[in-house]
Amino acid sequence: MIWHVQNENLILDSTRIFMKAFHLLLFDGSFIFPECILIFGLILLLMIDSTSDQKDISWFYFISSTSLVMSIVVLLFRWREEPMISFSGNFQTNNFNEIFQFLILLSSTLCIPLSVEYIECTEMAITEFLLFVLTATLGGMFLCSANDLITIFVAPECFSLCSYLLSGYTKKDVRSNEATMKYLLMGGASSSILVHGFSWLYGSSGGEIELQEIVNGLINTQMYNSPGISIALIFITVGIGFKLSLAPSHQWTPDVYEGSPTPVVAFLSVTSKVAASALATRIFDIPFYFSSNEWHLLLEILAILSMILGNLIAITQTSMKRMLAYSSIGQIGYVIIGIIVGDSNGGYASMITYMLFYISMNLGTFACIVSFGLRTGTDNIRDYAGLYTKDPFLALSLALCLLSLGGLPPLAGFFGKLYLFWCGWQAGLYFLVSIGLLMSVVSIYYYLKIIKLLMTGRNQEITPHVRNYKRSPLRSNNSIELSMIVCVIASTISGISMNPIIEIAQDTLF
């Protein structure tokens, strides 16, 4: 009899849970419609892969690209809608979150054609690669709209797990395995530190998990200036610093960049930065509203360290991917300026604008590296010597992207940095902006050093890799060149049309 009653209670509880989940999905599902499109694409990929004996590779790429493009279209149609909180407070939909989701989707869309030729030439498993990319993109999108501590922790873990699997995708490569192990161990440690900070925030606010409710809870408990909040701030800053590759939590970045497949590095170099920037902006601006002076100081120190260490160590690198790893550490230091400035002096708008330009500059550079690596099998900077004599298009494309990363006018990187530094100067961050300007000059040095190698015509400096270089061993008009052309055009002319980009970015403010 007791067993019968317990069984009935279990059925009733299960029914209530199912009905509540169905109700949430029915009435709140439209708020995560872009994410639902990606989930549908993932399911479709899995079904085709598991049921079809003869796998049509082009179909996999078509499904992945189409789901990403459709998600972008839905986001654009949803632009300027009223901010909404859905799924019992787990997600918040507004223009600010959606612009970061757009940047993540754009990065993933450009990375897929960049990886097609590489995967085919290296005979990697295609379906799993696309599944991991889409799942990581999904995790990044959920992170951008997350509104409570649990979702904010789970979403980046979804992204991180896929990142670990992607970085170790070439299982027979010893460097890749070593990089993945370092990435996994340090990623696990940083996640533990982050969730420990969340626990202090949760306790200090009286058991609240929603971001805005945490602020109200801190006011009610009078704990907003307590030591517990300072401890939470330190732990959360360390955890986010790892996600952003901020010094001194940057040691994993060069090894992962060097050991991972180049398309994976291209994907991680932009999507992880965008998602972590969205996380940092929301966490610091809302729950730590009363500790703004403290987190401003912390981020200033980390930004200065990142800009100095990243750019100075990049000078000494001989591997192109390691050089870009240290360069990205310096680049994220510039982005931190926008986070510190906030929405009062256009800081968020300048950060979003620069992130958009950074995506095109960085992916354009990696597209050139993928193309060169497939034709020569090398990543050494010295082996690029004389590339202009064999492939002027590739050499010029790489040169333009590197110059844009350095911030030389009239390229997009110059206008992006100009707007970012100007907003920082207006906010009174004179020392931070001065360091940024100085390190930008330093970065131009090592970018120009590579460009000088590209353009050299002296036979004694040209390595056998370039001397035996074939113009088109891959298919003509391949997908890598498509990504390369799009990114190079965006890196060169998008800075000229900055006004509409800035206006759109300013509309995303809270």
UniProtKB/Swiss-Prot annotation:
Enzyme class: translocase
Pfam families: Ndh2_N, Proton_antipo_M
MF-aspect GO terms: NADH dehydrogenase (ubiquinone) activity; quinone binding
Catalyzed reaction equations: a plastoquinone + NADH + (n+1) H(+)(in) = a plastoquinol + NAD(+) + n H(+)(out); a plastoquinone + NADPH + (n+1) H(+)(in) = a plastoquinol + NADP(+) + n H(+)(out)
Membrane-related topology note: Multi-pass membrane protein
Keywords: Chloroplast, Membrane, NAD, NADP, Plastid, Plastoquinone, Quinone, Thylakoid, Translocase, Transmembrane, Transmembrane helix, Transport
Localisation per UniProt entry: Plastid, Chloroplast thylakoid membrane
PANTHER family attached to this UniProt entry: NADH DEHYDROGENASE
Full protein name: NAD(P)H-quinone oxidoreductase subunit 2 A, chloroplastic
Organism whose genome encodes this protein: Lotus japonicus (Lotus corniculatus var. japonicus)
Name of the gene encoding the protein in the UniProt record: ndhB1
